[in-house]
């Protein structure tokens, strides 16, 4: 498998994106090293390095009954202002809009204000690395699906966010939130089944620029396509009967910034323990309690532990190439769609697409 390069170094880095997983009847635990499947920029926080992530997500999301994001974020669990809020299909964490100084990193990167507190800029796919070499995305993340046409002399530097925004087909899943709901790319279907860029319903408050981060924005229901969490219920190629899902947005319904870019709150009940950078670390995990506190029909394994004995609890070998192929989305929960997405990373190679082409109608995925 061909590795990828960090454009902030002079060396041929040959970084390898690596994932493995275990699952049982209720949860899936994904281990990743946090390195992407595409070339990237570490940015001022150079340089990105392999991490030890373990993310646990529910196979079947459960709505938070206290949360009504059509109205506001009141009653909803807010995504962390710093650190991971979701996971990409390549195992790289999604962060919220704010970066170290407290400003909206995406708005600053797009020239909405001058960041004078710290040197912050975003590279390919609006990602960069932070303290301890933690690579992450603040927006976009559609690099996981983009093809480099080497015969035409292309490199990853030819990737353009507009190529992901102007597609004639429904976008693929780019990741999953910690409540188990999928996150799609920019393009979705309108009420007539036609493709369009999906827009945020947030806008800057009068006189603000994003310099103060989240507090500079207000939710105004109806100006865009999405609710206060940056999600909606609608049909997708993977769920022709409809599902709640979040959308990676780059503009709002008025043509302004697409804050919050991924999600601001969780419509479902988010799994605890994922927001501390995936529970990674160097200590050996405590795997006691199998059959009593965790295991098939009981709950997910502790981070870093295998799936346990028998039943539907399963474990993969290390390495992304071990992820299996599913011809159609499995019935055992929405989150297993991530395995299908990750299988394409393995099947097509790390420099190829991480997901299949999808049909432009509402009938489903064309495989």
Please provide the spans of the model-predicted regions.
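C-terminal membrane-anchoring or membrane-association module
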Residues: 343-367
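Extracellular/lumenal glycan-associated surfaces
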Residues: 57, 90-92, 131-144, 239-257
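Core of folded catalytic or high-affinity ligand/protein-binding domains
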Residues: 89-95, 99, 103-156, 178-179, ...
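Extended, compositionally biased non-globular segments
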Residues: 169, 174-281, 285-310
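Surface-exposed intrinsically disordered loops and tails
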Residues: 3-15, 66-76, 102-116, 148-167, ...
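Solvent-exposed N-terminal domain segments of exported/luminal and surface proteins
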Residues: 1-116, 123
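Short, recurring structural edge motifs at helix starts
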Residues: 43, 120-127, 226-234
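Juxtamembrane/start-of-transmembrane alpha-helix segments at the extracytoplasmic/lumenal side
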Residues: 319-338
